[in-house]
Every structure is written in C-alpha cells, then in structure tokens.
Amino acid sequence: VNLAVALLTFSFTLAVLTLNPYQILLAYYMTGIRNINVDVIISSAIIAIMANIYKESNIITRLSNALLTTIKKVWLTISLIPALFGLLPVAGGALMSAPLVSEISKRINLDSNKAAYVNIWFRHLIAPIYPLTQVIILTSALSGFNAAQIALYNIPLALVMYAVGFIPVRKELRNTSVGVVRESISNLLYIIPLLVAVFIVVLGVNIITAVLLGLISLIVLVRPSKSLLLKSTFNKDVVMIILTTYAALSVREVLMLSGFPELFTSLFTDLPSTFLTVSIIVISMLLGFVLGIPTGALAITVPLITNVTHSIGLVSLTLMLTYLSYMISPSHLCLVLTLKFFKVDLHSIYKYLLSTTFLTFILMVITYLILFPFL
C-alpha cells in the first residue's frame, strides 16, 4: 500500500473517530496552510528535485568515485559509498549504492548476505545526522527544535551505530586497500550544493531558502539540459514526497485537534514521567517497524514526547531508536530492494542485522544516559 494513502487513511480514520465535521475540515486545511507545514512540504519537494538531478545526471556516482579515488582503506571505502548515496533522501535509495558495494565485496570475498547487510546498514547512517533529510525536517517541525540542532544531538548516537556496523564484517575488512574507478578531483565540486544547503540551515536560515539556494547552485554546476531538469522536477517521486509529507503532517494536526496528547498524558498522571516517556518511545519503535517508515511513526509520537517533556535529547533518542526499528522492517523499501539486488533472503541478512541492531539499541541508550545530561 502506498505510504501516503496509508497515512491519510490513518489520519482520516482517527479524525472521524475523534473530531466533528468542522474540525475534520479544519485539520486538513491547517495541514496545508500552517507556516511550518508549508516549509516542510516545499523543502521536501525541492530536496527530491535535487536528488533527481544528482541521479539522472550520474553526478552522484562521479562524486562518489572522486571522493574514493584517494581512499585506500577497505573499511572506509565500503562504508563510505552507501553513506554518500544516503545524501540523496529518496525512497529505495539503497539500490543506487548496491552495484558499487557489490563490486567492492567481490574484491574482498565478502559474500552476498554480508554485502547486502553492509549496503543497508551504512546507507542509513547519514539520514539521522543530515539536516536536509525528511525525517529530521519533520521531527524539527513537530518538536519545535532546529533541524541542525537535532542533527548535532544525533551525532554521538550515529557514531555508535557506525562502530557497531563493522562487527559482522570485521574479518573480511582485514584487507588494507581496494581499487576504485578513478575520477578527476574536480568532481568534488559537486558536493558544494549539499554543503551550501546544510551550512545555511546550520546558520538558522529558513529551510526553504537553504535548499533553494542548494538547488540553484546545483543547477549552475551541473548545467542540466532542459529535458533533464523537467524530468527531475515533474517527477512522480516529487509528487509522492509532497503527498507523503502532507499525509504525515495531517496525522499531527488531527492529533492536536483531538487533544489526544493531553489525553494520553492524563492517563498516566499517577505514573512517573520516565515510564510515560519510555512507553512512547517503545510505541514509536513498534510503529516504525510495522509501518516500515520513520516519518509515519514520528508524526504520531514526537508530539506526545514533547507534550511530556521539552527535551531535545529525548526527541533525538526517539528519532534514532525509531529509525533503527524502521531500518529492519520487512516492509522497508530499501531492505526489500537490496534483498532483490543481491539475491538473498530476509533470514540470511537478519542474522547480521538483528544482532547489530539490538547491540546498537543498548549502546545508544547507554550513550544517552551518560552523555546527554551534560549537553
């Protein structure tokens, strides 16, 4: 089932059960005109257009090879390639890095199961620390915290994820080097549009302005043909990003109008806030796994978390743990496409994915308890 349809069905069902007809209309109207929602929807569409230009012009492959030309360490090479493609926040994006990961895996005798694991795990390191991904933009809109702030808080947790990710493949990575397709260093310039957008977001400038300037700089650098530009802009992926973002935000509007966050909190008034917070995080993780998408889960649970405590640390932890549960979901599109590309089954990759996910979960919670009280 299409994610946008699923989210709209959920929000409409919830609206019918909790709101009167006027409030239902108001919820969907406010979803489309509330300033912060408009920012999220438009910026997500612009980012999708940028991703299409990078993909259709083959710039992302040239950029990857240019960055890797001087890198000889296997562990850096094989983790960096899927991570670089993670800069393109598109559905099923792991399929873009799969051919390169497969090629390197053959050179170091990494079997298909582990190659598929590497492609999934390291592909998803970027999103939680990259302010231009939909998951951070949406979490920022729902929590009220700056996107760059959330990304910075996620870095320690993402580093835990990065380190743990090497455990299943540590034996194969004993090789010290691997060859890559050499590219001119001038191709490194193509990373500038991404850096421009991120830098402007970090400065606290409106997200639409930031990604629009990133898009303009990308067009200036790439000089795409008119047909490529039109193909990248008027693309079904862009439309689906807009619809999915609107649908996710509509869940929040319905929840707010229904008074559900306050009602949910009041049910646990006699219980410690810690218990309530843990309950919400667990619910968020379960939703991430069931839905196979983090934004759908976070659209429901971030408003609940911020209603209990206005803590960016807890918002960050909720995002990361939800993201982990989504990553291993059988309905996760990147996982499905990776399994298909490498011709492996879910059970084979779960041998590595579940154990590293569980260990990462434990270490993330420990990192939060030790480090975040001082941030």
Task: Describe each model-derived feature in a short phrase.
Residues V5-L8, I41-I42, L76-L80, A151-L152, ...:
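Hydrophobic alpha-helical transmembrane segments
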Residues K73-Y153, I293-M320:
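Hydrophobic transmembrane alpha-helices that form the pore/transport pathway of multi-pass ion
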Residues I108-L189, L314, L324, C334-L371:
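Membrane-core helix-loop-helix motifs of multi-pass transport proteins
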Residues Q23-K106, L230-V308:
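Membrane-embedded alpha-helical segments and adjacent helix-loop junctions characteristic
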Residues V1-I42, G165-L263, Y368-L375:
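Hydrophobic transmembrane alpha-helices of multi-pass small-molecule transporters
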Residues L291, L321-I328:
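Transmembrane helix-bundle signature of multi-pass secondary active exporters and lipid flippases
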Residues I36-S44, N146-Y162, I207-V211, L276-S279, ...:
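Alpha-helical transmembrane segments
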